[in-house]
Amino acid sequence: LYLFITYTKRGIQEFMRRPKKSKYKSVVIKKKRYYFYKITWADITGDAGHATAHDFSGFLPSIMVTHAYMFSKDRKYVRTFASYEEGDELFSDRNVFPIGCIVKMEKVTL
């Protein structure tokens, strides 16, 4: 009798198992999950002043870091947002990055 109860209890526990939680930070909006990323990207740097050849050769793009939720990604662009309205599909603090500018993308873990 004891083995039967133990077996049944284990069977119920396996049946009632919760879905595996993601180890990545995300938000669900209108049944769609958006993951949080740290995006490192190269930004254009400009200067309208006079410079020597030595100064000009040391002139490099700025390496920027953005923390945001990824809205979409395709062959040309990555679209992100940082703010949203709960319970509705409204996004703000939006950016569109050309794929060529992105140096690195990392999913943020919990």
Model-derived features with residue positions:
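Short, Lys/Arg-enriched N-terminal segments with co-localized hydrophobic residues
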Residues: L1-F15
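Conserved RNA-binding domains used in RNP assembly and mRNA/RNA metabolism
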Residues: F15-L110
